[in-house]
Amino acid sequence: MPRKGHVQKREILPDPMYNSKLVTSLIDHLMIDGKRGTATKILYAAFDEIKNETGNDPVEVFQQAMENVMPVLEVKARRVGGSNYQVPIEVRPDRRTTLGLRWIVQYARLRGEHTMVERLAREIIDASNNTGASVKKREDTHRMAEANRAFAHYRW
């Protein structure tokens, strides 16, 4: 944590093909070992597959998937009097986006399809239809927050 003021957030430039900052962030989350070109190829191929399969604009399908995956509440461990409580807190907008992207990529990697292109396309389509592992993760997170609502007064 810096002692001199606030750290400036890095400006995310919009993606050249779809002109979307969210797509750029997805490329960043897909990227492994700094291989942006590979991540970009995978994403664009997945978007082509989404367009072929659904017939809709892939960016709109992706945005719908993000809306269905982004959590509103999460739990955070808080130590009070020698015991840890899972305290439900609201998720900040930037963290909501980050968690949504992270979960989509994480659960796409765990899927059974042969290529990452197919896995990512299927996970985004499933998430836009409110099914799939990433949506289940959001529901589990919300369920955990709801179960620990009694500890909400420990919020800080």
Curated annotation (Swiss-Prot):
GO cellular component: small ribosomal subunit
InterPro entries, alphabetized: Ribosomal_uS7 (IPR000235), Ribosomal_uS7_bac/org-type (IPR005717), Ribosomal_uS7_CS (IPR020606), Ribosomal_uS7_dom (IPR023798), Ribosomal_uS7_dom_sf (IPR036823)
Entry superkingdom: Bacteria
Keywords: Ribonucleoprotein, Ribosomal protein, RNA-binding, rRNA-binding, tRNA-binding
Gene3D superfamilies: Ribosomal protein S7 domain
Residue intervals passing through the bilayer: none
GO molecular function: rRNA binding; structural constituent of ribosome; tRNA binding
Role summary: One of the primary rRNA binding proteins, it binds directly to 16S rRNA where it nucleates assembly of the head domain of the 30S subunit. Is located at the subunit interface close to the decoding center, probably blocks exit of the E-site tRNA.
Protein name (Swiss-Prot/TrEMBL): Small ribosomal subunit protein uS7
High-level lineage: Bacteria, Bacillati, Bacillota, Bacilli, Lactobacillales
